[in-house]
Amino acid sequence: MSKKRGKRIGFVSTRLAGTDGVSLEAAKWVKILTELGHECYFFAGECDWPEDHIYCVPEAHFEHPKIQTLQNDLFDDYTRSSKTSGEVHALRFVLKEHLRKFIEKFGIELLIIENALSIPMNVPLGVAITELLAETTLPAIGHHHDFSWERERFIVHAASDYLRAAFPPILPNLRHVVINSAAGQELARRTGASSILIPNVMDFNNPPGVPDGYSDDLKSQLWIDPNEFLILQPTRIVPRKRIELAIELVRRLDLPATLVITHRAGDEGLSYKQYLQEYAKIMDVRVLFAAERFSYRRDRTTDGRKIYSLADAYQKADLVTYPSTTEGFGNAFLETIYYRQPIVMGMYAIYRIDIRPKGFRVIGIGNVLEEENIVQARSVLTKPELKNEIIQHNYELCRRYYSFDNLKSRLITLLNESFGM
């Protein structure tokens, strides 16, 4: 599409801010769409895009107290109260009216819904979006990162009517995009809906530049000895990330090393973080829960200390751990390759199905950490030539399969279909 025919596109989600996978991947879509001449606007409960392009509604956030109260009655239970049903519909009405105002304010011609019709983190928002699309026939794209049936905490629920209607809805003006082939197959099996596969990407045609010096003091700021290895766990602290295996790896390496975790405890509670803290003490491993020192962009804490970017973290790391059991795609995998680091990772299903056949060289772990994994990790840490060989091989594969060029061509096709062109 030429810039003369650019469209006004509205992104909708519970949160479009920070370092979570949905927000980061949405930002890549925005970058490509903007380069294609389109104007992007944002509706969410939390948003860190320019003020003149956002419409922020607190009730759209999954952490809003009213939404949290609803979640507690809708999930991990078999029945819900009539009060909950009434509150869902009351909030649905409020959110739908705000969505209408968002569309009118910015003249939105296409909506891209980022996971808000995929996983029921905010049921009233999903129902509101569904009704709005049914009432307006506005072209829309559902960008699905993960579905409710993929998460154990949504298996038991009292929300069947909402899930069938809105997570995701099946509407003639809504096109579905999935990030892995298994999700597309399961979506078709459950709903009969077709989907388009657009995997996550990074800008592999423009590799990261040489560090500019800002992060030269990263180790000293975190009280890590210059001779210690920095092992990086660049994920949220949730059980499916299996961070205890990263702790075990550091213990068994028999090398001076510190494990740095860059993200906060996720939306599944703090008990897992407490478990990891206790486990690290038992294993005598230094683990830094350093979320307050890392963000998507560089900044300063309220007391003036440096906040480093995720890019800084990757570039100063010696090895990345990613022992997840389940991922929708695996942003940390792509980021590790982009910043030219070796990776120890879990062989989660999507990696085995969609990614591994392309020939990547990783240290793959199964249900337990085996001695072979320890030997391989120690080798890449102590043999620079081996490390360089692996990271260059992986980078070239990502340039071929997961670059911005791939995303650009697919988005052009998707938008042409959405507008009937």
Where are the language model's segments positioned?
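Short hydrophobic beta-strand element within catalytic cores of glycosyltransferases
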Residues: 342-346, 362-363
